[in-house]
From Swiss-Prot:
This is Uncharacterized epimerase/dehydratase SAR0558. It holds the Pfam family Epimerase. Belongs to the NAD(P)-dependent epimerase/dehydratase family. The lineage of its organism: Bacteria, Bacillati, Bacillota, Bacilli, Bacillales. GO terms for biological process: threonine catabolic process. SUPFAM superfamilies: NAD(P)-binding Rossmann-fold domains (SSF51735). PANTHER family: L-THREONINE 3-DEHYDROGENASE, L-THREONINE 3-DEHYDROGENASE, MITOCHONDRIAL.
């Protein structure tokens, strides 16, 4: 990868992906795009940026051509809970945007990455140590989009020879960008509330285990997969990824090591709880580890320490300005 275009660059993953790619490949070699302008304090604005609605194929093609991109990371999407509230918009944005991005990759011979998700699984999927290849019958529009997306990426690889690569992300946890519309968002919100208010009301019930990963590990995984030897990639699209599996009570206990008086209550959201119940408790990541060396660095304990320290520092800086 030498010149990279990233869609959805202002999202939770996109923001940090842009920053990391610019560190590695050079600021001027990474074009960030999104449907809206970055805020004044966004790190994304410190380099090339263009407005892009991913459902506008002509505009996407224009940006790829003008930037002379050799790689496209397509991150723009409507997330699980938001997609369930507006399934038609979710289909139009998630699938229409992906088709446009894949067509751009085919037309301009781009290396291509897009994320899938544990949302691609469903009630009939084995819930413990979920295999790489298994039943995928999701019960949400977001999940349907992700399964279709995996199949489309594989189709473009086998039919047109497009170098497509993707991973099934678990819940991603970060202090840089606050969450927006995901089922696993409680695992980010809980840290902000712990620092700022000393208590949190979770919309996901106790005993609900979901796979999670710290954002630094997720960003490293994207870059590692994109730089991996093509000949070693047997799975290619939809690699299982996870670094840890926990429920809200486990996060509470980890936080209480630093904030002993932290309180956790529950007000379960039936929509997001229903989505969570359809996902695995834990997944098998052996293909990712074996084919391209996936090796997450953070567990719940180390992640909790980093999250709390980062939020404390962020609030200190904000209060001093």
């Amino acid at each position: 990868m030498k010149k990279i275009m990233i869609t959805g660059a202002l999202g939770q993953i996109g923001t940090e992906l842009v920053v990391k790619c610019r560190e590695i490949y050079g600021t001027d070699n990474v074009l960030a795009t999104d449907i809206r302008e970055p805020e004044a304090d966004s790190p994304v604005q410190n380099g090339p940026f263009e407005i892009l609605d991913v459902t506008d194929r002509d505009r996407m093609f224009e940006l790829v051509r003008d930037f002379e991109a050799d790689s496209l990371m397509h991150m723009a999407a409507l997330l699980s809970a938001t997609a369930e509230k507006n399934p038609i918009l979710a289909w139009d944005l998630n699938m229409g945007g992906l088709m446009n991005a894949l067509e751009a990759a085919r037309t301009y011979n781009l290396h291509f990455f897009t994320p899938s998700s544990i949302g691609a699984f469903g009630d009939s999927t084995p819930k413990v140590n979920t295999p790489q290849v298994t039943i995928q019958q999701p019960t949400t529009m977001y999940g349907v989009n992700k399964v279709a997306g995996e199949l489309l990426c594989q189709y473009y690889f086998t039919r047109f020879g497009v170098d497509t690569r993707s991973v099934r992300f678990p819940g991603l946890i970060s202090h840089v960008k606050e969450p927006g519309g995901g089922t696993t968002d409680y695992a980010v919100e809980i840290y902000f509330k712990a620092v700022r208010e000393g208590h949190y009301t979770s919309f996901i019930d106790k005993g609900t285990y979901m796979d999670m990963m710290y954002m630094d590990d997720a960003i490293d995984a994207i870059i590692k997969l994109m730089e991996a030897d093509d000949a070693k990639l047997e799975t290619r699209n939809g690699y299982n990824l996870s670094a840890m599996s926990f429920d809200p009570e486990m996060v509470k206990e980890a936080i209480q090591e630093y904030y002993p008086d932290f309180k956790l209550e529950y007000d379960v959201d039936p929509i997001r709880q229903g989505i969570a119940n359809s996902w695995p408790d834990s997944i098998d990541t052996s293909c990712s580890r074996g084919e391209w060396g996936f090796d997450p660095k953070y567990d719940l304990v180390s992640m909790t320490k980093l999250m709390l320290e980062a939020i404390e520092q962020k609030d200190t800086v904000k209060n001093n300005n």
